[in-house]
């Protein structure tokens, strides 16, 4: 009913198990979660996007969702807003260090998607996207679009809507500059730009058994 009332073009259903664990009113029973997702998808007439909430989607979850016929995802990886920390603070408790670091970073979730999703899947990147450079890297890793929330909300609250609009324009202009410098006419063409991978992300690629040289030369078409 809500989809029809809003004349929505799509429905985004979020996964937030980690957040629920630290919510006083949280639902800690995840039994039947996948079946519920399928039921929702089958009940609506618009595409359903499966979205995480700051903990990322790993290859194993992509595969499980693909098996159930889902083809649109928002990885919403770790690196941005930490919802378990927000819920813990709301209750006046401290989130321990081991759980404060829980989640798949957005970059790693995109790399897992590279190796898992078919080319016709829709892949959105969010979670720690703060700059034009972040957006360019996400597009280079195969994202079809990027999502940004926290900086916009902060600007609206502290400086007003106009400041948030200026921020979006600045991001768009910055992305265009990256595209020009890299010889790309569209964000999608950033996927053809060779990558240099170092540090923990290089270790992640090795631990996953992905072929580094091939991945650095080609991503989702």
Q: Residue locations for each model-derived region?
A:
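Alpha/beta enzyme core
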Residues: 1-126, 132-155
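Alpha/beta catalytic cores of nucleotide-metabolism and tRNA/nucleoside-modifying enzymes
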Residues: 97-122, 130-221
